[in-house]
Amino acid sequence: MTELIKLSAAALAAKLASGEVTSVQVTQAYLDRIALVDGELNAFLHLNAEEALRVAAEVDADRAAGKELHELAGVPIAIKDLIVTKGQPTTAGSKILEGWISPYDATVIEKIRAAKMPILGKTNLDEFAMGSSTEHSAFGPTRNPWDLTRIPGGSGGGSAAAVAAFEAPLALGTDTGGSIRQPGAVTGTVGVKPTYGGVSRYGAIAMASSLDQIGPVSRTVLDAALLQEVIGGHDPKDSTSLVDPINGQTGCTGLADAARLGANGDLTGVRIGVVKELGGEGYQEGVEVRFRESLELLRGAGAEIVEVSCPSFGYALGAYYLIMPSEASSNLAKFDGVRFGLRKLPEDGPMTIERVMSATRAAGFGNEVKRRIILGAYALSAGYYDAYYGSAQKFRTLIQRDFEAAFAQADVLISPTAPTTAFKFGEKMADPLAMYLNDVATIPANLAGVPGMSLPNGLADEDGLPSGIQLLAPAREDALMYRVGAALEALHEAQWGGPILDRAPELGAASNATAVEGTK
């Protein structure tokens, strides 16, 4: 079953449909893989093996009975542990929710269940999705399958590592400032942030409600497109969910067709804009070399490469780190030790609600979460709201206008996804600003609500680790992004002789023991 787990989700779906393999066989193969390698990676926080095999058996029975099934029926999936799943733990990577069992499903989980995709389990993340390395999880860091001494990105490092290590063919993540795309870049996977509102946020534990977006993690562009079609669409339970009053579209239809069209590698007439401000100083040389090589591939495929300038992008990081913590400080107020989750009682003194809340939050939240709550509360405080939060929202408007101007010159925009390849554990923990700079290229898309995709862009010369390339499209033009992404993927694989993950080191070998021990 070793080769089975390395197939794309689309290829697995085809084998399932033809009867060549069963869903139980596929699901068991991934569970066996998790048992073999996750002790090294720590990608999963909770396994859902019994239910996954039950759903797989139901799919096999339905298929044998000739029932009509979704294309991805029987294809397993992993879920970031920020998305609630009924009857299963949802921790958000935090001690404050340790042991909490969700009484309901997120909308995306309802859709996954309706498609009859077996849920393998819940994946690790930075606490409440606050981080760029998955080092801030209360349950230990996830390790990068390419080098166990390095980070897998964040906040969704668990989902990216699981897909990269062949523990799952697909996963769900959330992206507030790059938490799907940046892990994709450093693990050699595909990560997509859909148009804001294109996928329901109902049931995703909110960090920053105006920025958060659920999206797919996969090994191919087509797989991501197929998954986004499953989870996308209007949801009346999410007040920010998009719906077009004319045609009812949200930007989550026709994606797989667009990816299949792009796979022929022809981009004749497509204008691709290189964002001047997303490169240069601070970007690793090997990342930029691979980026320039990809531009030449795109030019050779008929695309017109133009340079565009978005001056306000230079302020995006600052605006984000005022807006995001402000919204997070409000969203996390519900974790008070009274309603649900951890309750820590004060050791002495009067037993008031305020003192229970203080003791609970002090014990339940990690340092990065506390840092952002304090920053957000300060930015929203009387006398400072206009100077900080209000000013950041004005810069957000400028960023949106720069996107509009750029898309008047180009059909899609392109940049490196992250400035560097994966860094060593502990390398940036003492310097929050250095950590935050990992998201400098991904944050603008969240501030503007436009879709973004990261796909593998080869291995950097300095360290032989994956780098990523990012595509950005106008809002609701997700299909165009998938078309260009699939074309670039086809061009890359023709150059590389196959998917980049084929070059990843083997896991589960005794030779990795030293590397694992070094990260503990």
Swiss-Prot record:
GO terms for biological process: translation. Pfam families: Amidase. Allows the formation of correctly charged Gln-tRNA(Gln) through the transamidation of misacylated Glu-tRNA(Gln) in organisms which lack glutaminyl-tRNA synthetase. The reaction takes place in the presence of glutamine and ATP through an activated gamma-phospho-Glu-tRNA(Gln). Heterotrimer of A, B and C subunits. This is Glutamyl-tRNA(Gln) amidotransferase subunit A. The active site is at residues 80, 155, 179. One of its GO terms (cellular component) is glutamyl-tRNA(Gln) amidotransferase complex. One of its GO terms (molecular function) is ATP binding. Its EC number is 6.3.5.7. Keywords: ATP-binding, Ligase, Nucleotide-binding, Protein biosynthesis.
